[in-house]
Amino acid sequence: VVAFFPDDTVIISGTPDVIRRYFDRLISKVDKEYIELLTSFRKILKNRNRLLKDILYKRDIIKQLDIWDSMYSDCASALVIKRKQYIEHFNTYFKTLYKELSGFNDDLTIKYYASLHNENVTDVKNELSKKRNIDIQMGTTTLGPHRDVYVIYGNENTMFKSYASTGQRRLASIAMKLSEVSLIYDIKKSKSIVLLDDVLSELDDDRRKNVLQKLIDGNHQVIITCASSNDVNFVDNYKHLQVVHNRVSE
């Protein structure tokens, strides 16, 4: 299931952790190994951070960090490699879809910035070693996949959210969700059930039609909620259900 909601623009203009969680959920839908890596990484990170706090008062346990750093490096390296692979794949859809939906000649691309300078396991261990004193002082792990950032750029390598209007952000968020649908089909060869919860009303007729046409062309099962049937009057064949006072009728 891929759902479109009115507040989806947060994946365009939200904080780094919000956008990172979006891509974590997306990759997890198509890659079971990624879910396992992410789950392991979070447990390792939690234990490492707890140990860092304890070391402030018990310096004699500092050697225990070597064990956690080794596990952390293995997991972090694998996560970064997968994220790079999937964002490259995702961009092949996103660039095209945004142009087709919006009609703008804006060449959008999503860049992934890993806080680790190199995903090689040995290099990750070396980076952790260099940051060890800082990590101990702060009581937390200051680099790794939990600090990674995804940024959307437009023409002339300008950050998209710095100039995008509300409408452009809405279209970009829809383009991201449609890219998600395409990625899932490309990898798993399964059609998504697509849910659109009152996201079409903000679009003009041309762009609303573009979105619906993309979904129709993909032959997906689509469920749309909207305040007015005019939002979907471009579609010829659909089942119309009306909800009045919590009662559903055709």
Label the model's feature ranges.
Residues R25-K32, R50, D54-K58, D74-I81:
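General structural signal for alpha-helix termini and helix-helix connectors
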Residues D197-V199:
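Walker B catalytic acidic pair
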Residues V1-L51:
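Extended, charged alpha-helical "arm/stalk" segments used for dimerization and assembly
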Residues T225:
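Conserved D-loop beta-strand region of ABC ATPase nucleotide-binding domains
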Residues R25, S229-Q242:
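Short regulatory helix/loop adjacent to the ATP-binding pocket of P-loop NTPases
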Residues K58-I193, E202-D206, N210-Q221, N230-V235, ...:
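Conserved NTPase motor "head" modules and their coupling/switch loops across ABC/AAA+ ATPases, GTPases
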